[in-house]
UniProtKB/Swiss-Prot annotation:
Listed EC numbers: 2.7.7.48
Matches recorded under SUPFAM superfamilies: DNA/RNA polymerases
Role description: RNA-dependent RNA polymerase which replicates the viral genome.
Species for this entry: Cryptosporidium parvum virus 1 (strain KSU-1)
Gene Ontology molecular function: nucleotide binding; RNA binding; RNA-directed RNA polymerase activity
Enzyme class at the top of the EC tree: transferase
Protein name: RNA-directed RNA polymerase
GO biological process: DNA-templated transcription; viral RNA genome replication
Length: 524
């Protein structure tokens, strides 16, 4: 693989390349009255150089010795591979460059050598032309030309006093297109139940019903594993196994095989422009790759299956479990105490070099003590894909009202008008408003904006006046509504603040179709 020195490259606009991140303070939205959202207990991360150095340093910490059982590891890989092949087959074909670009998120960074802030949509022609030129190089047995990733950060909400900005590897856009040519072929096939792509919390309770009752309540225990620094600690051996499984799904030509080898090499040995120097990692998963989620999912499946094979009593049921990245919802045939679960199952992850956060890992059995539930208020639950699944058959979403206040008042990007604030609040009510107290809290803030519905529609749909702002409205609106929440409502329905029962029915089903969760036996 040919590495291109960043200092020898001029940006397409002829200006020098910027290094690092310029940290800026996140201010409260000026359109939300302070009286409605009082003193906030949360703030957003600040991507200072010191904190970003800590994040990147996790990819280079000394590795402790780990000795997996090779026989069990290979068996786990074969089991996971069999599950993927049984659903996708072995004859997928790589898609074209243009089709790949159509399925990429258009508002994300185009990476180097484009200027900071340039989106993939703005750089689409040059990106696709460069991607095609790389296919020509590989077909002539030349090395893939690569650029380092651009440094980025995600400023998430934290309790005051904490600061842990999330490191983003902003991939060069042309490499994202080439990677996505493989991924698009996979996403054309409806996902199996064991991949989180099949889970949609706004499907009338079907996903919840499948997770809890898809096996007619025959599970004995369920768990959710929380990893510490999962992306930074994944070892190269596991990534090789994941790419092996990914490759087995395709019928590849010689050129496509070579290209996948070089993409894997870049995925493992990823360079990043880190302020005034270029750093190259040799382990871990980079966050900006098109392969990030699917490789992380396969690695997670392999690790969980390996721990199951190495434990004495935990038989993992893959068809009724679910994974997405480092998130997991595990279904077991055995019910033992929490201490036994930690000793017999969680300890096995250390053999693969993965760190499990014991305190944040949730485990519960179907044998729930009736006395503790009724008189002590014990509510066993697991968390999956940002939601809290109560085993007593109640789906909860956002109990931390202080954090909800911060989400309303502290936008990650500055609100350009009250109408953009309204769009964010509509997104929040669809994401968290299935409980009435939370719904009313968001509605109260929304009404304080005093928006005119017809002007709201005009601002979002019109390109005629202030096109740079209307474009921003559209990008924020459609990315949150269409991509993240998977809503299939008409756009004019989405622009109005929804009624409570419309939101509730999306999560739990209508009163005629609502799942009768209480009819299931929940006590052992």
């Amino acid at each position: 693989m040919k590495f291109v020195n960043i200092y020898e490259i001029q940006r397409f606009d002829g200006q020098p390349t910027r290094h690092g991140i310029a940290p800026k303070k996140i201010f409260r939205s000026k359109y939300i009255p302070t009286g409605l959202v009082p003193r906030l207990k949360y703030w957003r991360d600040v991507p200072s150089r010191a904190e970003m150095s800590k994040r990147i340093g996790k990819y280079f910490e000394d590795e402790f010795k780990f000795y997996p059982n090779e026989e069990k590891l290979n068996e786990a890989v074969n089991i996971v591979q069999e599950k993927w092949i049984s659903h996708y087959g072995t004859s997928l074909n790589v898609t074209s460059v243009s089709e790949s670009f159509r399925t990429l998120p258009k508002s994300t960074s185009a990476g180097l050598p484009f200027k900071s802030g340039c989106t993939k949509y703005e750089a689409r022609n040059k990106m696709m032309r460069f991607a095609r030129s790389q296919w020509d190089r590989v077909s002539k047995e030349l090395q893939l030309q690569v650029l380092p990733c651009r440094l980025g950060a995600r400023c998430q909400l934290r309790k005051r006093g904490e600061n842990k900005p999330r490191l983003i590897w902003a991939y060069p856009g042309y490499l994202s297109i080439i990677e996505n040519q493989y991924l698009t072929a996979i996403k054309k096939v409806p996902p199996p139940n064991f991949i989180g792509w099949s889970t949609n919390w706004l499907d009338g309770g079907k996903s919840l019903n499948r997770l809890l009752f898809g096996d007619k309540w025959t599970w004995q225990s369920i768990a959710q594993i929380d990893f510490s620094s999962f992306d930074a600690t994944v070892r190269t051996e596991l990534i090789f196994h994941a790419f092996k499984i990914l490759r087995s799904l395709f019928d590849l030509t010689r050129t496509e095989n070579i290209m996948l080898d070089q993409l894997r090499h870049y995925f493992i040995n990823t360079p990043i422009l880190f302020y005034d120097k270029i750093i190259v990692k040799n382990r871990g998963i980079p966050s900006g790759s098109a392969f990030t989620q699917i490789i992380g999912t396969i690695v997670n499946m392999i690790a969980c299956q390996y721990a199951s094979l190495r434990s004495r009593d935990y038989n993992l049921r893959i068809p009724f479990s679910c994974w997405l990245g480092d998130d997991s919802f595990l279904n077991f045939e055995t019910a033992l105490c929490r201490q036994e679960f930690e000793y017999d199952y969680l300890e096995k992850f250390k053999e693969l070099g993965l760190n499990v956060s014991i305190d944040k890992t949730h485990y519960t059995t179907r044998f729930i003590d009736d006395f503790e539930v009724r008189f002590k208020g014990v509510r066993p639950y697991v968390k999956f894909l940002g939601k809290q699944i109560d085993i007593l058959l109640d789906l909860t979403f956002h109990n931390d009202l202080d954090k909800l206040d911060a989400q309303m008042a502290l936008p990650e990007k500055e609100d350009l008008s009250a109408y953009e604030t309204g769009v964010r609040l509509i997104g929040l009510v669809w994401a968290y408003g299935a409980h009435y107290d939370i719904y009313l809290r968001i509605l109260k803030v929304y009404l304080s904006l005093k928006l005119k519905p017809e002007f709201h529609v005009q601002q979002l749909l019109s390109y005629s006046e202030k096109p740079e702002r209307t474009k921003r409205y559209q990008e924020n609106f459609f990315s949150s509504m269409k991509y993240q929440l998977n809503l299939d409502l008409d756009i004019y329905d989405l622009l109005a603040f929804p009624k409570f029962w419309d939101v509730s029915n999306r999560y739990f089903g209508s009163k005629y179709e609502r799942l009768d969760f209480r009819s299931h036996k929940i006590y052992g």
